[in-house]
Each structure stands twice: as structure tokens, then as C-alpha cells.
Amino acid sequence: MVQNHQTVLAVDMPQTGGSKYLDDDGKNKRTGSVWTASAHIITAVIGSGVLSLAWATAQLGWLAGPVVMLLFSAVTYFTSSLLAACYRSGDPISGKRNYTYMDAVRSNLGGVKVTLCGIVQYLNIFGVAIGYTIASAISMMAIKRSNCFHKSGGKDPCHMNSNPYMIAFGLVQILFSQIPDFDQLWWLSILAAVMSFTYSSAGLALGIAQVVVNGKVKGSLTGISIGAVTETQKIWRTFQALGDIAFAYSYSIILIEIQDTVKSPPSEEKTMKKATLVSVSVTTMFYMLCGCMGYAAFGDLSPGNLLTGFGFYNPYWLLDIANAAIVIHLIGAYQVYCQPLFAFIEKQASIQFPDSEFIAKDIKIPIPGFKPLRLNVFRLIWRTVFVIITTVISMLLPFFNDVVGLLGALGFWPLTVYFPVEMYIAQKKIPRWSTRWVCLQVFSLGCLVVSIAAAAGSIAGVLLDLKSYKPFRSEY
């Protein structure tokens, strides 16, 4: 079916450049640049993960904390560059495009690995949606509580239930989920990227202010001391910290989809490598600053979520602005992550039921003074059901730190390391047991060990949380 489509295109237009309005694959001209791709990546990367980095640094200490962050950033940049080379099969300029991560795996590896990749990728996206729902509710409650504390002068404990805030976030996502394509999200990505800088800067400023108030830099070279936690807890927490940092860098699962929005020439691979370098450098700088400043301010007592753990010090309005920025950012980030999953399910449905009006037909809703709104019934129902499911699970499992660590651990090795390395080896035809092949395999194996350790630490954390937990009764 795809081959027939390409033959028709070859008759209609030159294969090299497409036309004025269409690209070489017959789709509308792509308009993305280094900057829009960087905005998409920054939106996906500087998510709620940044807020757990002070806690992660506290587990690892002044020595290992920054080193681990730098190592993860180097790994992410390296594997993202390998992945960017797999956007086109064959020739990097005119080869067949792979529109999604799964398409790239199908072209380069094939077989059971495609199914495996799909399961891991889409489960990870599903998990990220849950993580972002929890994080947004925590930030909304932080605004409410800080105002409650301010009014009562700290006399009222201001306890509240997280469920209404998760439901509110879910309702907003149902609305935004009706945006049909990833291409149309550029404005939401840029807004979300600006918001991520806003709250990261606020966290950084509050960390610096707290260090000034303390009159010293807290923390130690080896992290949280035995005594404050048991030896076993120290090990589990160190592993969980690795998962938290891995989650803070996880965006490989949507890299190919972002690359598919980029115009050429220059080749999409070159643009994407530049965008990856820009965004990974910017995020690493922010991560180092936020993680280290949070640890310097709080030492062993660094909170799991930096902005909500600041207590409710003045200036309370700055905390409110920062938490509002987190919520706006997470609304955008949720969409940037979930759109590839939405597109995959809708594509599969149209392949399975090509003659179904329910799946294919758009309803035009007239809006006075504007173009009519095109609404697809299947899209409306399935995306709404997806958001409802993620919201309900978030209400069942509101453990921010442990969920973040587990997601990072489960997604990091297969999606950020294993598949990019294997695809690169297949595409460049690197011979088995050559020095290059052995180095890549050792690199992949090392990352697998880190992932297993991080997953174990996070599972231990979830089991600990479950001991004192009542479903749908999360009080903060």
C-alpha cells in the first residue's frame, strides 16, 4: 500500500524536492526549524522531573550528584544523535522517511522488536501522562495552601484533597486533546518552554535566597547520612535518585515525531542534532543549577518536589507564579507526549476499519466569525476516554517521586539507549565484534544495569508508600 502511494508521487512530482507546497512524501511542506524543535524538546524534557532533582542530589551528595547529571546528559545527547540518523532509511537526504519511533524500528530492525518497542513506548507515554497529572495537582494545591497559610498566618494546617485538582487538569486535557496534529502544537510548545524557564528560575532564586538566609551551603560530599536514614534506605534512595534523573532527561520516545516537523534542506538529521545540542545544554545547565541550589538550601531535608517543599515562606506570590507556570507547562507537555500515541491509535483504527464513517468522518461545527470547527467523533471519544483513565489512575497512585523514578527507570534503557544503538548498528552495518560494535554494546549494557537498579529503588519506594495509603483519599 505504501509502495503504490510512493509510485504515484514519483509520477506527479520530482522525488528530490517535492513542490512549493508539498514535501517529497506528498505531505504538506514541513516548516520546523532548530528553534521550534528545541522548543518541543525543552517542553518535553524540562518537565516535572526538574523539581525532584534537589531530592536526587541530596541522596547522591555533592560529588556523585552533579557527575550523574552530566553523565545522563552526555548519554542522552549521544543516543539522540544516533536516533536522529535513523529518521530516513538509506540516504540521509532523500531516503524513505520514518514518521514515528516505531517506523524507524520497523525499517531498521523489524520483527518482534517492533512490537516490543511499541509496547514500551506507548506504556511509557501513558505513564508520563499519569506523572504529569499528579505533578499538576500538587502545584495547584501548593497555590491554594500558600494562600490559605498567608491568610491564617500559619495557624490553619490547610489540609486538602488532591482529587478535585486532578479532575480539573483532566478536563483541560480533554479540551486540548482535540488538537488534531503534532504540527499544530508549536504555539503550545513555545508557551510551555517559556513556563518551564519561569518556574525553574523561581526555584533557583528561592534556593539562592534560602542559602543566603542560612548563611552557609548545606549538604555533604556523600549525600544523606546514615542515621537520618538506615543503610538499606540509603541504597534504595540512591537507586531511586538515578531513576529520577533518568526521567528528567527522557524525551527520546518523541524525538522522531519532533524531527518529522522539521523542514529540509539542510537535512533533518543536521537540524535535529543542532536542536538536541541546544536543548540538552540548556536543560543540563538548568538541572545543575536547580538540583544543586535546592540541595545547598535544604541539605539532607531537600524535598521531593522543590517548589511545593519550600514551606510557605515569603514571597508567597513568587511561589504562586512558579506553581502556576508548572501547571501551564504540564498542560503543554502532556500534549507533546500524548499526541504520538493518539496518532498511532487513530492510524491503526483507520487501517482496521477503512470504510467506517465513525472513524473517518469529520463533523463541521459553525463558529460565528471563524472557520467552522472540524470535529472527528472517534477522536473526541477515544482521546476523552484516554484522559479519563490517566486521571483516575493518578487519583489512585499519587506518589510523585516514586512514580517519576519508576517511569524514568523503565523507559530509559529500552527507548533512550537500546533501540537507538541497535538501529544505528543496523543502519551503518557495523560488523559484529568490531571495536565500535563492542564499545556500543558495553555502553548499552552499562545503561541497562543503571536502569535495573533505578527500577528496584523506585518499586521499594512505592511499596513503602502503599503501607500508609488509602485509595482516592490523598490528603496533603
Curated annotation (Swiss-Prot):
Its main location: membrane. Residues 1-33, 79-122, 299-300, 346-384, 427-441 are cytoplasmic. Keywords: Amino-acid transport, Cell membrane, Membrane, Nucleus, Symport, Transmembrane, Transmembrane helix, Transport. Inhibited by carbonylcyanide m-chlorophenylhydrazone and 2,4-dinitrophenol. One of its GO terms (biological process) is basic amino acid transport. Belongs to the amino acid/polyamine transporter 2 family. Amino acid/auxin permease (AAAP) (TC 2.A.18.2) subfamily. PANTHER family: OS05G0424000 PROTEIN-RELATED (PTHR48017). This is Amino acid permease 3. It comes from Arabidopsis thaliana (Mouse-ear cress).
